[in-house]
From Swiss-Prot:
Span list, region Disordered: 505-539
A Gene Ontology BP annotation from the UniProt entry: cellular response to phosphate starvation
Chain intervals with Basic residues compositional bias: 526-539
Species assigned in the record: Arabidopsis thaliana
Protein name: F-box/WD-40 repeat-containing protein At5g21040
Annotated signal sequence range: none
PROSITE patterns tied to this protein: FBOX, WD_REPEATS_1, WD_REPEATS_2, WD_REPEATS_REGION
UniProt xrefs under InterPro entries: F-box-like_dom_sf, F-box_dom, G-protein_beta_WD-40_rep, WD40/YVTN_repeat-like_dom_sf, WD40_repeat_CS, WD40_repeat_dom_sf, WD40_rpt
Cross-referenced Pfam families: F-box-like, WD40
Domain F-box as annotated: residue spans: 65-111
Domain of life: Eukaryota
WD repeat coordinates: 160-199, 201-239, 255-292, 294-330, 334-373, 382-419, 433-477
One GO cellular component term: nucleus
S-S bonds: none
Length: 539
């Protein structure tokens, strides 16, 4: 791989100090621009050549033979900040100096956060995470892992529920799966082994929503209550669902006047949506309802992000400002019929909806000062029945439908980041992202969740299935290892051949071949010559 600059930045080392172009003199503005005081650069006739405008002495060709690595480190860092992950990886292959700058650049943390949020590490492994592994290593591993959803998989089927499963939740950081449904029992499963860990007592009504983090587990019932479990320090599986522990960790929140259909958590709040046409926001410290967002129809789904919250009510989608309890934007009739499901990217800028018409839509939330607008980006029709559930983990959007199928949609090409302008831009490509359909259910699928290399779903059959893609992950790792070994062997043979040629005084045969057949237009002319000799080329 090689790094190509469209406009080569050249400056003389001996002029840089005289002109004041030093690391300590650089100032980075609020808009991301770099201010270079006391120096004005003008462009000479030679393309890409930058010369101080006040300089009286012309620079010689020898002085102008510098490269980008001769720029101040702060300026190079700002240039690297304008690159995407692929480009930043290419830069790290140019030289040892650029490899160090690119590998340690702070942009890798931002790349990771934009796609998956900051990592939540559970257990003893959380100590020393930043010291042991760089953000680049974490990003590369997560990006590599996300590609395995197109590979082989195995299916674990979990039995235990006696009736339909209405909701599933995957807590990947603790390797736990929570499920519940018409039998009113919340069950906890081991994600790795697929074994039942614990089950709660019957809660008295259908459980239609679950949400959890490492501190709190909440379940929403059709009787309008939120049943909560606090985690216990030192307990391997976090939550005491059975009530065997001496410490009391269970309690209920009351306030809704109808069945609870959706739940979500953040660091400070609990969000609950209900058929009473409201979304309630509960403070996690006092466990009191602090805000209520009123809708015009039943609430089916919600997705909070920082100070905003997206919700579906009837066929409409709302974007709320939580602090003022007012809607920033409304998408009327997002789907034909009810809009059942909702998912959101970690940046909060992209929204995914699924509806009764079997369609899935992707919207971008754009903010211009105090104004907020929502723009349709793309849409798909992968299902023949209503889309009851959506789950998103970059770059995969996973949907569960009444037709008994799961659809995997890669939205990578639709999420392009222009870091230099600190804004989002949407790819103009009209080609739909690749899809993968997962079959195996003969009836309705009501809920799905995705995390790392697992997809968990539940439906009318009363079973829970875990689609395990670790097999594809191991195959891909072995393939990469073999490719690396082959490349290393080729390079070793190449070096040995060069050493032998140098000892014998013979020219390098590969260099001669490259000189005779350069990788440029010469190859095209040879191809056209063959084409003229053999007549018209076939289409």
């Amino acid at each position: 791989m090689e790094f190509e600059c469209q406009e080569r930045l050249e400056a003389a080392n001996d002029q840089r100090s005289e002109s004041g172009l030093l690391n300590t003199d650089l100032r980075i503005g609020n808009d991301g621009s770099v201010e270079i005081p006391n120096v004005k650069l003008c462009c000479q006739k030679k393309k890409g050549t930058l010369v101080p405008s006040g300089s009286k002495q012309l620079l010689s060709d020898k002085d102008l033979s510098t490269t980008i690595i001769d720029l101040p480190q702060a300026l190079i860092s700002e240039i690297l900040n304008c690159l995407d992950p692929k480009e930043l990886g290419l830069v790290s292959c140019v030289s040892t100096y650029l490899h160090r700058l690119a590998s340690e650049h702070h942009a890798w943390k931002e790349f990771y956060r934009e796609r998956w949020g900051l990592p939540v590490v559970f257990g003893a492994a959380s100590s020393g995470l930043s010291d042991e592994r760089s953000w680049k290593d974490l990003f590369v591993e997560r990006e590599f892992r996300s590609r395995t959803f197109l590979g082989r998989y195995s299916i674990d089927t979990l039995y235990g529920h006696t009736e339909a499963v209405r909701t599933v939740f995957l807590l990947a950081s603790a390797k736990l799966v929570f499920t519940s449904g018409y039998d009113s029992i919340v069950r906890m499963w081991d994600m790795e082994e697929g074994l039942s860990i614990a089950a709660s007592k019957p809660l008295g009504c259908t459980i239609r929503a679950l949400a959890a983090d490492t501190k709190l587990l909440v379940a929403g019932g059709t009787d309008g209550f939120i049943h909560c479990w606090k985690s216990l320090d030192g307990l391997r599986n976090l939550f005491d669902l059975t009530g065997f522990q001496k410490e009391k960790t269970e309690f209920r929140l009351w306030g809704h006047e109808g069945p609870i259909t959706s739940l979500a958590l953040d660091m400070t709040s609990i969000f609950s949506g209900s058929w009473d046409m409201s979304v309630r926001i509960w403070d996690r410290s006092s466990m009191k309802c602090v805000k209520t967002l009123r809708h015009s129809d039943w609430v089916w789904g919600l997705a909070p992000h920082e100070t905003t919250l997206a919700s579906t009510s009837g066929s409409d989608v709302y974007i709320w400002d939580v602090s003022s309890e007012t809607p920033l934007a409304i998408i009327p009739d997002a789907h034909e019929g009810t809009t059942y499901s909702l998912a959101r990217s970690h940046t909060g800028d992209f929204l995914f909806t699924g509806g009764e018409d079997g369609g899935i839509k992707m919207f971008e939330i754009r903010r211009y000062g105090s104004e907020t607008s929502v723009v349709l980006i793309s849409q798909w029709m992968p299902h023949t029945s209503p889309v009851y559930s959506l789950s998103f983990e970059f770059p995969w959007l996973v949907s569960a439908s009444g037709d008994g199928k799961l659809a995997l949609i890669d939205v990578r090409k639709l999420l392009k980041t222009n870091r230099c302008a600190y804004s989002k831009r949407i790819s103009s490509s009209t080609v739909e992202p690749p899809q993968r359909m997962l079959h195996g259910f003969g009836s309705n699928l009501f809920s799905v969740d995705v995390g790392y290399d697992r997809i968990v779903c539940g439906g009318e059959e009363g079973t829970v299935r875990i689609w395990n893609f670790t097999q594809a992950l191991e195959i891909e790792r072995r393939t990469r290892a073999l490719k690396g070994m082959r490349h290393e062997n080729r390079m070793r043979r190449r070096r040995m051949q060069m050493e032998m040629n140098a000892k014998n005084g013979r020219p390098d045969q590969c260099s001669i071949a490259a000189h005779k057949n350069p990788i440029n237009g010469e190859r095209n002319r040879a191809w056209h010559s063959k084409r003229r000799a053999s007549g018209k080329a076939k289409a």
